[in-house]
Regions:
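A short acidic, glycine/proline-enriched capping/turn motif at secondary-structure boundaries
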Residues: 120, 154, 163-165
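N-terminal periplasmic/intermembrane-space "pro-region" immediately following the signal or transit peptide
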Residues: 11, 20-90
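Surface-exposed extracellular loop regions of Gram-negative outer-membrane beta-barrel proteins
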Residues: 162-169, 173, 330
């Protein structure tokens, strides 16, 4: 299918709210006014605290109302027939995915929303086939919303967020608008840092699906121990890390419950994944190793077309070197 026109617009605007109201110092009295001041008033003035006079001459501190930033992005395509390939125009002659994002920050507090609008989802994106869900406009189009408090050694987030444990083999929640992909998590997350030696994350959330959430529950934790910081290695960075994620199904899938007698395995409502990692860095050299294990889960065997129920595991090893004008990764 030939795409005649593709419009991609990214518009960002940042508004800085100082909300500062300056208060001018009280002007000094002129000579005529000074002459009218009685000796009694002068005597009273002599008894005043000189510090209070100094404060009254200073302007009040300016008030900070925070920082507001926003962006708007639209990916719009108009489709035309292509006689060479035989491609025809879909039911809707155009597709359009639109995103409006606003973020507000005041000190350690932050909050944000993301509004999405799909009058006709783009062909070839994951939303295709779910037009009946995407089309139109309602409160469900407010897909991302969060509030967060970030302190020096901890943070708390409630709402929708993105997260990744390790390399992302057992947990990765991310967004790619060009691909039309978003599997953010809606729930709560807490992070902490103890003297740059121990860092951790814990979360409980529901994964996003279309404009809503799945009933599947995700609970997990990630912990990192910096051995180099603990023993005072300045040039080397060595850390030991681990993660665990539990995926809990509120209800077993219908394809299993309706045809239970056709399967020779008992599908569990809980699937646990875990990983252990070692990271090492020295100047330009870096090396990472991760092992991942997974409890029994079902997947479709592409060779036989049958459902298979078994444990899983994976290993990932990366090594690289970064020089002044080059980098090598394997």
């Amino acid at each position: 299918m030939k795409r005649l026109l593709r419009i991609t617009v990214l518009f960002s605007v940042t508004l800085l709210w100082w909300g500062e109201k300056g208060y001018a110092a009280t002007p000094a009295m002129d000579a005529a006014e000074k002459e009218t001041v009685s000796a009694t008033v002068e005597a009273e003035a002599d008894k005043k605290d000189p510090k209070s006079d100094k404060k009254s001459d200073e302007p009040k501190r300016k008030r900070n109302l925070g920082h507001l930033s926003g962006s708007f992005e639209t990916n719009t395509i108009y489709y035309v027939e292509d006689s060479k390939t035989g491609a025809v125009v879909p039911h809707n002659s155009y597709g359009s995915n639109n995103f409006l994002k606003l973020d507000y920050q005041l000190g350690r507090f932050s909050a944000g929303v993301q509004l999405e609008y799909y009058p006709h989802p783009l062909v070839g994106t994951p939303m295709q086939g779910y037009e009946y869900v995407m089309e139109g406009f309602s409160i469900n189009n407010l897909t991302e919303k969060y509030i967060s408090w970030t302190d020096r050694n901890y943070s708390v987030t409630v709402g929708d967020f993105y997260e990744q444990f390790g390399s992302g083999l057992i947990l990765r929640a991310w967004e790619d608008r060009a691909l039309g992909f978003n599997n953010s998590l809606g729930g709560a997350r807490v992070t902490f840092n103890i003297k740059d030696i121990v860092e951790g994350k814990v979360l409980y959330a529901f994964p996003r699906f279309n404009l809503g959430y799945l009933s599947t529950q995700i609970a997990g934790g990630d912990l990192s121990f910096s051995l180099s910081n603990a023993i005072g290695l300045l040039d080397h960075r060595l850390s030991l890390e681990g993660s665990i994620v539990n995926r809990h199904f509120k209800n077993l899938p219908s394809w299993y419950t309706e045809y239970r007698d056709d399967y020779d395995f008992d599908l569990s409502k809980n699937v646990i994944s875990y990983s252990g990692r070692v990271n090492y860095e020295y100047r330009g050299l870096s090396a990472k190793f991760e092992y991942v294990g997974k409890s029994k889960d079902v997947y479709l065997d592409n060779m036989t077309g049958e459902e298979v129920f078994k444990r899983g595991d994976a290993q990932l090893f990366e090594i690289g070197y970064t020089g002044s004008n080059y980098a090598v990764m394997a």
